[in-house]
């Protein structure tokens, strides 16, 4: 008794094995990508939330691809292998469907990436605006700091100048007061000789020059000392009454020139 056995075409067996191998490879690839995604997520959880960079954008893209592949893997697990006749029309139809699906997935990914890029662009513009504002504030503060420093220097110089001016004015006033007091003292105690006695009349007549007071002689010696400190000597003139000169020399108020006795200078009491 013979049994009817249904023979399976070798090409059909080969096609089924190819589909199974493809599914296993796809599952293996998805598992590897899933493991990589978990590692990346663990690293990101340790780093914390930061502004997206190029690496973060690529990571987001990989995560979306992983989700798509996971969904596709789930569909593959639910599907049962079917023996499909591998003719040209069927393959063309399947290829179109796969390409259409891939196109939809890529358009979705592209839309997501464009949305993230727009957000990053807005964040960049906002950060750039903040940076420009901070730079303007910094420039303004630098200008104010420079103005304050210049003002401080100006105020310091002005204050010093005013203080020196006040001191000079006070010294001049004290000098005038001192000269007036000295002049009054000298006029009272060392007046010019009067032509009341014959001896004085003869001494005055012998000199044709007009005699000057002791105060005027001292002022001349003082001015010479401060105006020409390197040559403070004054030549004795006919208008200098000789007793005045002897008085100044005797009490050490004036000194003769070591080489020219006709010149005298004031003793440098200030040195």
Swiss-Prot record:
Localization per record: Nucleus; Chromosome, Centromere; Chromosome, Centromere, Kinetochore
Cellular component aspect of the GO annotation: inner kinetochore; nucleus
Origin superkingdom: Eukaryota
GO BP of this protein: chromosome segregation; kinetochore assembly; positive regulation of transcription by RNA polymerase II
Keywords for this protein: Centromere, Chromosomal rearrangement, Chromosome, Coiled coil, Kinetochore, Nucleus
Positions in coiled-coil regions: 11-44, 102-151
One Pfam family linked to the record: CENP-K
Tissue specificity statement from the Swiss-Prot or TrEMBL entry: Highly expressed in testis.
Subunit architecture: Component of the CENPA-CAD complex, composed of CENPI, CENPK, CENPL, CENPO, CENPP, CENPQ, CENPR and CENPS. The CENPA-CAD complex interacts with the CENPA-NAC complex, at least composed of CENPA, CENPC, CENPH, CENPM, CENPN, CENPT and CENPU. May interact with Sox6.
Function statement: Component of the CENPA-CAD (nucleosome distal) complex, a complex recruited to centromeres which is involved in assembly of kinetochore proteins, mitotic progression and chromosome segregation. May be involved in incorporation of newly synthesized CENPA into centromeres via its interaction with the CENPA-NAC complex. Acts in coordination with KNL1 to recruit the NDC80 complex to the outer kinetochore.
Family that this chain belongs to: Belongs to the CENP-K/MCM22 family.
The protein's name: Centromere protein K
Species of provenance: Mus musculus
């Amino acid at each position: 008794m013979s049994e009817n056995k249904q023979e399976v075409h070798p090409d059909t067996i080969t096609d089924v094995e190819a589909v199974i191998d493809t599914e296993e490879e796809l599952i293996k690839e998805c598992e590897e990508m899933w493991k990589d995604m978990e590692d990346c997520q663990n690293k990101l959880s340790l780093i914390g939330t930061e502004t997206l960079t190029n690496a973060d954008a690529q990571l987001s893209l990989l995560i979306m691809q992983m989700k798509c592949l996971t969904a596709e893997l789930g569909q593959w697990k639910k599907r049962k292998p079917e023996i499909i006749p591998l003719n040209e029309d069927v393959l063309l139809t399947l290829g179109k469907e796969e390409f259409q699906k891939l196109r939809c997935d890529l358009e979705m990914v592209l839309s997501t990436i464009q949305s993230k890029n727009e957000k990053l662009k807005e964040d960049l513009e906002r950060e750039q605006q903040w940076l420009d504002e901070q730079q303007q504030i910094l420039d303004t503060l630098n200008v104010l700091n420079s103005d304050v420093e210049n003002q401080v220097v100006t105020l310091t110089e002005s204050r010093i100048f005013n203080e020196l001016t006040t001191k000079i004015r006070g010294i001049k006033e004290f000098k005038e007061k001192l000269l007036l007091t000295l002049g009054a003292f000298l006029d009272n105690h060392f007046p010019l000789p009067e032509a009341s006695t014959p001896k004085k009349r003869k001494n005055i007549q012998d000199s044709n020059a007009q005699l000057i007071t002791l105060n005027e002689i001292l002022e001349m010696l003082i001015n010479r000392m401060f105006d020409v400190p390197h040559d403070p000597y004054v030549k004795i003139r006919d208008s200098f009454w000789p007793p005045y000169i002897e008085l100044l020399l005797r009490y050490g108020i004036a000194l003769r020139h070591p080489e020219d006795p006709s010149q005298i200078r004031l003793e440098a009491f200030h040195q």
